[in-house]
Amino acid sequence: MLAKRIIPCLDVKDGQVVKGVQFRNHEIIGDIVPLAQRYAQEGADELVFYDITASSDGRVVDKSWVSRVAEVIDIPFCVAGGIKSPEDASQILSFGADKISINSPALADPTLISRLADRFGVQCIVVGIDTWFEAETGKYHVNQYTGDESRTRVTEWETLDWVKEVQKRGAGEIVLNMMNQDGVRNGYDLEQLRLVREVCKVPLIASGGAGTMEHFLEAFRDVDVDGALAASVFHKQIINIGDLKRFLSEQGVEIRLC
């Protein structure tokens, strides 16, 4: 059995790490490189960096900090932000990233997924899915351009259909960003995760809602996700990654201990 992964998420805006609630009202957390170093030292299995306004601004992620991060950490990391072509991806990978993640650009042009997978291999192509539960309809829908609340829009894609589509096109991993739970710290949306797990045959990463160690345990034990991504509990030092991994190991979760 592959070890489960603990993945801190660093949302980047204007060169600094920020964090919002339900993808809004972002506050500055700190500088990118020191935070990356801290999480690597605490025992993170990998890191994810989202340049949250790159797609909505029509630009590619700022590559200068990508190379600085690669110089100071020795764990895998994934970068997302405005990647619209194999050339964009090639540059980011050449600066030291191990994986690239696409989200809004894939919704704008789904062929991008297969073009990237064909060139670089599915192992380094992650698709992020920003999913929102509409209480009125009882449905989960995919959102686009979520880094800029003035441009965020609901797409025609229902979440489960998009999960199936991106796998068909070559996604090697899916990060499910559950927007209703983002930054609230009241637990992952286990019901949605179960629905997605049934149709997701590639590694599935849960994102949005972690507030306690038990929340991570529930995602691994009850849904069998492959990794759990979180931000605010790590940024605000509510949970220490080393302590979390020891807790999970004691509960029988296969995890890499520091």
UniProtKB/Swiss-Prot annotation:
Localization per Swiss-Prot or TrEMBL: Cytoplasm
CDD domains, A to Z: HisF (cd04731)
Documented EC number(s): 4.3.2.10
Any Pfam family matching the protein: His_biosynth
Reactions catalysed, as given in the entry: 5-[(5-phospho-1-deoxy-D-ribulos-1-ylimino)methylamino]-1-(5-phospho-beta-D-ribosyl)imidazole-4-carboxamide + L-glutamine = D-erythro-1-(imidazol-4-yl)glycerol 3-phosphate + 5-amino-1-(5-phospho-beta-D-ribosyl)imidazole-4-carboxamide + L-glutamate + H(+)
Catalytic residues of the enzyme: D11, D130
Membrane-crossing segments per the record: none
GO MF terms held by the record: imidazoleglycerol-phosphate synthase activity; lyase activity
GO biological process entries: L-histidine biosynthetic process
Pathway annotation: Amino-acid biosynthesis; L-histidine biosynthesis; L-histidine from 5-phospho-alpha-D-ribose 1-diphosphate: step 5/9
Functional summary from the UniProt entry: IGPS catalyzes the conversion of PRFAR and glutamine to IGP, AICAR and glutamate. The HisF subunit catalyzes the cyclization activity that produces IGP and AICAR from PRFAR using the ammonia provided by the HisH subunit.
Similarity-based family: Belongs to the HisA/HisF family.
Entry protein name: Imidazole glycerol phosphate synthase subunit HisF
Organism of this sequence: Serratia proteamaculans (strain 568)
Origin organism lineage: Bacteria, Pseudomonadati, Pseudomonadota, Gammaproteobacteria, Enterobacterales
Gene this chain is encoded by: hisF
